[in-house]
Amino acid sequence: MMRSDKQFQLASLQNNLLQEFMEACRQYKQRLFLGCGFVDEKTPRNSCAIISPDGTYYNRHDKTKVVPWITENWAHPGEKFEVWNLEGINTGVMVCADAYFAEHGEKIAEQGAEFAVVVAAWPPGGHGGPPEEAWKRLSRSANGIPVLICNQTGTEGMDCSHAQSAVLCNGEVLFTYEGREAVLIIDFDEVKKLVLSTEFVTINLTDI
């Protein structure tokens, strides 16, 4: 979520902005997909940085479809989609509007994707119609693989108070979450590559 009390900065491998996230991943032995502004070789990107469970930086996806709005016109578009083997699951990653285009699902399917993670700031309605229709299209075009949408909430920067996080499979929405900032947990069979949950397990951040 955007923080009005924090100055906007771009992460890089040369500064320490990712350090606290890397330390948390190491401490809890969890992988993190972190939506953030990122700068590499003096080129700013709207990215999803991937941090490994041992606390090291792994890789990143740079958003390919940069919209010409004030919220994003600072970023240069990425050029490619990659699929990484993460804990035995071939995983594709996208940022927000990347998920709108069926051909992007086809690109990760061609590379053997079994799961997709999308970090987003995508309120309901707006440009391009309901976001869930784009997410369904993405899942279908990627051979029906499970898609996890991690969406922004809150009202800072823009109104995402009704934005939904979601899990999809075979081109259909399985379940969603809408509300305050929370930790959302699902049960996933990493061998059969199946979503076992029928709803999110929700932990409100105020309860932590």
Regions found by a protein language model. Name each.
Residues 61, 84, 150, 177, ...:
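Hydrophobic residues at beta-strand termini and immediately following loops
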Residues 13-33, 100-183:
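CN hydrolase (nitrilase-like) catalytic-core segments centered on the catalytic cysteine
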Residues 1-11, 118-120:
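Short, conserved active-site loops that position catalytic residues or coordinate cofactors/metal ions
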Residues 10-14, 40:
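Short secondary-structure transition/capping motifs
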Residues 184-190:
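Exposed aromatic-hydrophobic patches
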Residues 34-39:
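Short beta-strand-to-loop element that shapes/binds the nucleotide-sugar donor at the catalytic cleft/hinge
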Residues 40-111, 124-137, 161, 190-208:
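Active-site catalytic loop in hydrolytic enzyme cores
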